[in-house]
Structure formats: C-alpha cells, structure tokens
Amino acid sequence: MLTKRTDNVEHHKGQVSLPGGAIDKNETAQNASLRETKEEIGIDSSSLKSLGQLSSLYTPVSYFNIHVFLWYSETQPQIKINDSEVDQVYKISLDELIDNNLVLNTPINKSGFKINVPAYHFNECICWGATAMIITELKDIINES
C-alpha cells in the first residue's frame, strides 16, 4: 500500500511513499512503523502480522534514516485516511508490483526543476527516490524466492 503525501507535511510534499514518519523518544522503529500506519491510514496493528524488515536507507534531502517493515493482513483492512498527512492511498497488487519494471528516465518536477529519475509507473502513481529503492529491494527478494 502506497500513499501520496499532502502539501501540508514538512518533508516530501505531494510525493508517493509508504506510511511512516519520525520515531518518538523511547519508541522502537518497528513500533513507530505501526503507529504511523495507524495515524496516516487508520490500519490498526492488531490486524497486522510481521513479514520482516528490509534494509534501512538514508535520505540526505530530509536527513531521515528509513527503517522498512513489511506487514501482512489476512483480511482487507479498512482504510481511514488522515487528510492532513495523506492525500490518497494506492493499493498495488503483488502481481502489479512484480510485473512492473523500473523506467530509468522519468521526468519529475522537484523544487521547481524538471529532472529525470528512475521510477516505477503503476496504474495510478509514479514512485521514485527512496520509495523506488525500497520497492526494488522487495522485488529482488520476491524474485529470489
């Protein structure tokens, strides 16, 4: 599940991302992942099962060290968007994720400049940057299985 961030958030305005945010004091990265998922899209942690963790990565633009956790739900979770943080939710099927290839020269607008970046083009959204890197690692793990 991917989200499009609103223009109200401090970092990565209008970009497609995974639910997430800063780790609170005395909180684990895994607990922050669950809390942010609940805050942003309303999915309660009691319905989620852990599938593990991907590699952490650093984003120099926002100075975040991103910790990626994979969660699974046996039932279709009810989505409740926090419209101050999330503009839209995109449900990407596993088949669509696996079948999608990275497009190397995708033009995007970044801070008033048009640049070309590697990105995934899903039916409803384009993922680039850290989100594309996370998707690439997940696809590699799935393809190795």
Question: What are the functions of these language-model segments?
Answer:
Residues 1-18:
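N-terminal strand-loop-strand
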Residues 22-116, 120-123, 127, 136-145:
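Unchanged
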